[in-house]
Amino acid sequence: MKIRPTICCAALLALCSCNTTPQKPQHADALSLSNPVTRKQAIKTAYAYVNLKWEATSNNRLHGLDPNGQHVDTPDADAAPQLGSAMWWKPGTNYGMPYKWGGFDTPEEFLLRLAQESPVYAGDYASDSKVAGGDDAVSSYAAGIDCSGLVSRCWNLPRPYSTRELGGLCVQLQDFSELQPGDIALKPGTHVILFDSWVDDAHSVFYAVEAGGVPHWKCYRYRISIETLKRLGYTPHRYKNIR
C-alpha cells in the first residue's frame, strides 16, 4: 500500500493545532461498542485519508459566509499570506483530505460532495471563532474531517466522537511503549492522533496519522516522540473493540 510520508519536525505545533473539538455528549453509548474493527482495517482507513487524491477548483474556496451564514475559511494556499503557511491546497490535483471543523466525511463522500454543482467548500480550519462556537460553528457546506472524526472513522464508529468522549471507549495503557497500530495518543478536549508504527526498536518515536494543522490543515503521516507527547499531557489509549 502506497504511503505519502510526511515527516513533521514541528510536531509540537501539530499536536496543539486543533484546540477543542466540537463538543458532543460526553457519555459513550453502548452502540459504539458493537462495531469491532481490526488493526489492519484501522490503518487502511487512515491511509485512505492521507493518500486521497482529489481535484479542486476555485469554487471550492471560501473565506466568508456560506449560504447558511456560517463563516468558513478553507485551507487553500491563496489564504496563506493572511492565515499562515498551513493553508495549502490549490486548484487542480491535491493529496490528503483537508481538515474541516466538525467534519466526518468518508473519502467517498468527500469526492461525491466536491462533484456536486451546489456550493461545497474544501475544508474549514480550526480558527479561534470555530473553537469558541463549538458545534454551532460547523458548516454543512464545508467538506472534510477533523482529528476525532478521523479516529472515529478508523474505528468504524457510527458517529463522530469528540476528544472528550473517545477515552470512554478505551482502556488507558500503562505506558506508551504498549501502543499498537490503531491505538491513540489522547488529550481530551484538545486533540487526538492515531498510532501507526514504531520508528525505532527503543519505542521512543513512532509514525502517527492525524487530521491536524501543521504543516498543513489536512490528513497526514509524520513522526512524533514519546517525550513530546508526555510533555504535552497526552496519554496512550486502546479502543475496547479493536482486534
Question: Model segments located where?
Answer:
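Low-complexity, Gly/Ser/Thr/Pro-rich intrinsically disordered linker/tail segments
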Residues: 219-243
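...with weaker cross-activation on analogous glycine-rich loops/strands in unrelated enzymes
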Residues: 157-222
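Sec-exported extracytoplasmic/periplasmic mature domains
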Residues: 51-55, 152-160
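C-terminal motif of bacterial Sec signal peptides marking the signal peptidase cleavage site
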Residues: 15-17
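Bacterial N-terminal signal peptides that target proteins for export
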Residues: 1-8
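Extracytoplasmic low-complexity repetitive segments enriched in small/polar residues
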Residues: 42, 72-75, 210, 220-224, ...
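Short alpha-helical patches at coil-to-helix transitions and adjacent helical residues
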Residues: 144-148, 179, 237
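N-terminal capping segments
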Residues: 22-148
